[in-house]
Swiss-Prot record:
Its main location: cytoplasm. This is tRNA-2-methylthio-N(6)-dimethylallyladenosine synthase. It comes from Psychrobacter cryohalolentis (strain ATCC BAA-1226 / DSM 17306 / VKM B-2378 / K5). It catalyses: N(6)-dimethylallyladenosine(37) in tRNA + (sulfur carrier)-SH + AH2 + 2 S-adenosyl-L-methionine = 2-methylsulfanyl-N(6)-dimethylallyladenosine(37) in tRNA + (sulfur carrier)-H + 5'-deoxyadenosine + L-methionine + A + S-adenosyl-L-homocysteine + 2 H(+). The lineage of its organism: Bacteria, Pseudomonadati, Pseudomonadota, Gammaproteobacteria, Moraxellales. Keywords: 4Fe-4S, Cytoplasm, Iron, Iron-sulfur, Metal-binding, S-adenosyl-L-methionine, Transferase, tRNA processing.
Length: 497
């Protein structure tokens, strides 16, 4: 998945940072009244393309924030008018590196036409490849990792200095180190438009699943201090955000330090967030079954702000494959967790991640995965054919499942999930659901659109003259019609918050 992030977060004050300033003449009375006015320097524009997970979407927003705060840059939708091109990369899938270099090849043509264009590569591929990116693509000016994106202004300045010193033999700047979680100390105050926001509460992962590159590209788990997380959420809520999505590679493994030095675990954090004025809905991703503890499950009984949707990756329905993946839990443990949650929230909607065709996966292993999907009736899933990732333990295993078999199994599995998605959306008709109202429908100007707890888009008619006052409200909508697998239509019943 590749998403271009257009998030204009730059305030007017930041734009003044790059205004040309009239030289100061210290000798009094020497300033000529006839002095010609100095024109403002043109505002630089930045274009960001984002691959991969929601953590990357969050990071891309922060890239825009830091460059706006430091250099007054503005985001652009048009790559042809950009002064800076940033690619935030993902290395989860096979051939991720080649996709990056393919896109960079297209960007090279732009730079040939505009030599002053600055190109930067960030994210997990940048962490993996490091200075190899500039060896293969010497026209790249900046390479930075997820933990060093706060240093973008410095890297940008260094790239300009390199041009001035050695325009023909320029050496780009590379910073893919794993400092502590310091980047959050250097990021500007969060700015957002809309009623939803991501908040990163931790970085990295220490689970070391055999197939996964995340511990190698984002480092070990590091949790942000509790006060820092709550301060960011307070700021977002003050800007009108109603839904907070807590992010982390292993988000429910959060262990943030409190003022007194004690540790705040994830379930306790959920309670703190629920008490922030203005926050009406809480989501989180991505979770690990090992950290999905009873106190988190109990929170679903205690906190109405927690949406009735859970994304809990399981990866396979076979205990043998889970062991090979080093997931360190069994299917029985996973099913027991889900059953406990359903006892508390019968209307909970589940989604998960699945890897099909992992090395050693037999027909029975795959059948176990199909059986799990049918038993738990997942709402949707992110399912992929296994991709060998260099440097991971699984890459050393014999890849003994043919590509043809992998494709056939994936198609069969995805049909089970698609059928479940369709059935669950149809089941919404005649029920009432909670919706965050977000915008006027583009194609139906007499209707408002919002998101239900279960991630479905909900459209409902409303008085055109009063639509603005409904934006950002939490409403109850009775569903009347199925529109598509991920969209329904209904009638508003009440304003809840």
């Amino acid at each position: 998945m590749s998403v271009t992030v257009f998030n204009p977060r730059i305030d007017d004050a930041a734009a003044s940072d790059i205004t040309a300033v009239t030289p100061v003449i210290t000798a009094l009375n020497e300033l000529s009244s006839a002095q010609a006015p100095v024109e403002k320097a043109a505002t630089k524009k930045v274009f960001v393309t984002t691959q991969g997970c929601q953590m990357n979407v969050y990071d891309s927003g922060k890239m825009l924030d830091v460059l706006g705060d430091s250099h007054g840059m503005e985001v652009t939708h048009n790559i042809d008018e950009a002064d800076v091109l940033l690619m935030n990369t993902c290395s989860i899938r096979e051939k991720a590196q080649e996709k990056v270099f393919s896109e960079l090849g297209r960007w090279r043509k732009l730079k040939e036409k505009r030599p002053d264009l600055v190109i930067g590569v960030g994210g997990c591929v940048a962490s993996q490849e490091g200075d190899n990116i500039q060896k293969r693509a010497p026209y790249v000016d900046m390479v930075f990792g997820p933990q060093t994106l706060h240093r973008l202004p410095e890297l940008y300045d260094q790239s300009h200095q390199q041009r001035e010193i050695a325009p023909k033999n320029r050496i780009g700047t590379v910073d893919v180190s794993f400092p502590s979680i310091e980047k959050f100390d250097f990021l500007p105050e969060p700015r957002v438009e809309g009623f939803k926001a991501f908040v990163s509460i931790m970085e990295g992962c220490s689970k070391y699943c055999s197939f996964c590159v995340v511990p190698y590209t984002r480092g070990e788990e590091l949790s942000r201090p509790l006060d820092d997380v709550l301060a960011e959420i307070d700021s977002l809520a003050a800007q009108g955000v109603r839904e907070i999505n807590l992010l982390g590679q292993n988000v429910n493994g959060y262990r943030g330090e409190k003022d007194d030095g004690s540790i705040c675990r994830f379930a306790e954090l959920l309670h703190y967030v629920s008490h922030v004025d203005g926050v009406e809905r809480i989501r989180y991703t991505t979770s690990h079954p090992l950290e999905f503890t009873d106190d988190i499950i109990d929170a679903y009984a205690q906190l109405p702000e927690l949406v009735s949707h859970l994304h809990l990756p399981v990866q396979s329905g076979s205990n043998a494959i889970l062991a090979a993946m080093k997931r360190n839990h069994t299917i029985d443990v996973y099913i027991n967790q889900i059953n406990k949650l359903k006892a508390i929230r019968p209307d909970i909607h589940l989604s998960s991640d699945f890897i099909i065709g992992f090395p050693g996966e037999t027909d029975q292993d795959f059948q176990d995965t199909l059986n799990l999907a049918k038993e738990l009736n997942f709402d949707h899933s992110y399912s992929f054919i296994y991709s060998k990732r260099p440097g991971t333990p699984a890459a050393e295993l014999p890849d003994d499942v043919s590509f043809k078999t992998k494709k056939e199994r994936l198609a069969e599995f995805q049909k089970v999930i698609i059928d479940s998605t369709l059935a669950k959306t149809h089941e919404m008709v005649g029920t009432t659901t909670r919706v965050l109202v977000e915008q006027v429908a583009n194609r139906h100007p007499d209707c408002l659109i919002g998101t239900a707890d279960n991630t479905r888009t909900v459209m409902f008619p409303y008085d055109v003259d009063k639509m603005d006052e409904m934006l950002g409200k939490i409403v109850s909508v009775r569903i009347t019609d199925f529109v598509s697998p991920h969209m329904v239509k209904g009638e508003i019943e009440a304003v809840l918050a």
